[in-house]
Amino acid sequence: MSIVVKNNIHWVGQRDWEVRDFHGTEYKTLRGSSYNSYLIREEKNVLIDTVDHKFSREFVQNLRNEIDLADIDYIVINHAEEDHAGALTELMAQIPDTPIYCTANAIDSINGHHHHPEWNFNVVKTGDTLDIGNGKQLIFVETPMLHWPDSMMTYLTGDAVLFSNDAFGQHYCDEHLFNDEVDQTELFEQCQRYYANILTPFSRLVTPKITEILGFNLPVDMIATSHGVVWRDNPTQIVELYLKWAADYQEDRITIFYDTMSNNTRMMADAIAQGIAETDPRVAVKIFNVARSDKNEILTNVFRSKGVLVGTSTMNNVMMPKIAGLVEEMTGLRFRNKRASAFGSHGWSGGAVDRLSTRLQDAGFEMSLSLKAKWRPDQDALELCREHGREIARQWALAPLPQSTVNKVVKEETSATTTADLGPRMQCSVCQWIYDPAKGEPMQDVAPGTPWSEVPDNFLCPECSLGKDVFEELASEAK
């Protein structure tokens, strides 16, 4: 089934609702994807790109329903990767002499995948044109390393449509083709996820290339991407976002991610987050256990953040494998304008945190002090973690801290007598979580100021879910 894009331009691509892994397992496509191919019918008929190789036969069959394959005058390949040019072998078996227009680097890539050097390749460079009749031309723009050396974009005059290749796309599958027809929150999330995980390493190239394209002073009524939606409603909004994201992007956000063997590093992460939130309530703090989280969501949050705290237990004197792998991906993504700190628990040796700090520095992060805890952190160690979070919040603040948090220590000291009147704090003997009467436990409707004696009998420890009977008076407060 084809979809009219504009005038004589039809979408003849393929939706892929089922795909969940892209580039091996490097990118999780939780909302599927699409492989966008476009058929232009003017005096000359032009096919722009094909689809992923696994849909080759379906693609050629569907294309034959749209047009006699022999009537295709030109094939344009903006990118030789298999999700763009994968159906070429199946198609060229039917029309072997059809001219293929692509960059010089694309010929190498296409031959590397399809092994047909006899195909009728025609090399194009930035500014080259191809007349397709009815007063319209294709204008080619090379975009090397966005995100392969062979990449280019193609602009159709008259209709003012930019076929943008991977740029401005998203791995997002929907029955609707146009940006104004889909859920805007989902669309924005997938656009940012796509940029953060795929195009971030090339941010230094994005701005000059967009500036070069804008310098042609060509109107852009639509941007037809290789994946996801076609931008027809205010199409340059995504261009503006790319310029913003390419400029060492950061929000007032801190991402904490960790892996843990015995829950100890998780306890540290929670306490650090508490310290950050106490000191700078404006900052968004996001916490992820890498063993239970989508790594591309973690990386998207790192992209958005001003800084990242990475935690690992020590195993065989090195960091946990999932942490090592994710930090390696962060190195490849080449994040800029971000700070980092390493933390973690250990037993008889603590080599992981030092190795992690070195790896983060090698990845281009501006490093802050690291933090270590031996075995399961007790109340004193957790307070050190909270203080570490407070110091991180102060060092990484993008603006002067709110006066209310600056004065918080003084207020806490003046309220010490009142807190003491509420009775002792109680500690879970299993996981060491502490109930503070002054704070209560809002998640279980236990209001601040509730003494332990008035806490309902059905109360459960928020950390290990055991009941009140495992709690003991905090040793430092026992009489």
Curated annotation (Swiss-Prot):
Subcellular compartments: Cytoplasm
GO CC, any one term: cytoplasm
UniProt xrefs under InterPro entries: Anaer_NO_rdtase_flvorubredoxin, Flavodoxin/NO_synth, Flavoprotein-like_sf, Metallo-B-lactamas, ODP_dom, RibonucZ/Hydroxyglut_hydro, Rubredoxin-like_dom, Rubredoxin-O_OxRdtase
Region (Zinc metallo-hydrolase): 30-210
Cited Gene3D superfamilies: 2.20.28.10, 3.40.50.360, Ribonuclease Z/Hydroxyacylglutathione hydrolase-like
Positions with a binding annotation for Fe cation 2: 83, 166, 227
CC cofactor note: Binds 3 Fe cations per monomer.
Cofactor(s) this protein cannot do without: Fe cation; FMN
MF term (GO), any: nitric oxide reductase activity
Pathway named in the protein's UniProt entry: Nitrogen metabolism; nitric oxide reduction
Annotated keywords: Cytoplasm, Electron transport, Flavoprotein, FMN, Iron, Metal-binding, Oxidoreductase, Transport
All residue ranges annotated as the Flavodoxin-like domain in the record: 254-393
One matching Pfam family: Flavodoxin_1
Subunit structure, as described in the record: Homotetramer.
HAMAP family for the chain: NorV
Family: In the N-terminal section; belongs to the zinc metallo-hydrolase group 3 family.
PANTHER family to which the protein is assigned, alphabetical: ANAEROBIC NITRIC OXIDE REDUCTASE FLAVORUBREDOXIN
Protein name, per record: Anaerobic nitric oxide reductase flavorubredoxin
Gene encoding the protein: norV
